[in-house]
């Protein structure tokens, strides 16, 4: 173990999210320590290892060396989506705990394999959804579960970004990405709605389209989708790779409504506002390093030998739901969501 009170990590994948968010978070975490970094670019790995205090750096071909490092207790997987399962299972087979970026994998079958291998080697598996720890989202969850909004009826959520010219090519490669805007940003709408409702959807509908056929030959640019939950709750969701960056989440109940804006971006002031019984409320939440909270929560789960939240099953469910949305778009009909 890296230190008596800190879990040692190897960060696998040094793309944008790692460089701007995950690596800086290790500097401030009291429970997780960066030991090594792994990248396809050894010069970049060396530069970022030196910048952020990792003692060692490796290429993907040297991944086994990172897994054999005596101070590495866990891996944070932030590679392209299509390689999540491979790197996660190799880590688990080396008895390393796994924190994996969303989406968990490109298929339900890969997700199930990840869960089974982690279980067989008695290692923890967590999916990197920050909403479970971010204070504004937690406050909204508490408001919903308190019953003050009454019985939930409708949720609206969207996450849109405008991919700039020169964006990494893997975003447009179905084999590497698994999909387009739905799996990259729409997944937040899917996961957060399930978390708030406290139930899983039973039916999915979807519609996908693109305004740039030359740029989006393999994956979708825009998605509009609907999830039907038990007891009549419905989520209307949307995601885009071709709209200005924004995100929101609106929750409507019989007694009131609440909204979170922005809902999913990090390092921004969040507003939680709404109306209950004719009375307006609003609270602002200053930016907080959600990645530190995520790292600390996973490290604590490892130390206490308990299943983290959100675990691998939550990631699998989101992948299954998104596959149902895609199937609905292909077949132009609602698709039952089967999560048994």
Question: Could you tell me what each predicted segment is?
Answer:
Residues 17, 40, 284-296:
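Active-site loop of classical SDR/Rossmann-like NAD(P)-dependent oxidoreductases
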Residues 1-52:
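N-terminal Rossmann-like dinucleotide-binding module
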Residues 18, 100, 125-127, 237, ...:
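Hydrophobic residues in well-ordered beta-strands that form the structural core
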Residues 191-266, 292-306:
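Contiguous beta-strand/loop segments that form the cofactor/metal-binding neighborhood of enzyme cores
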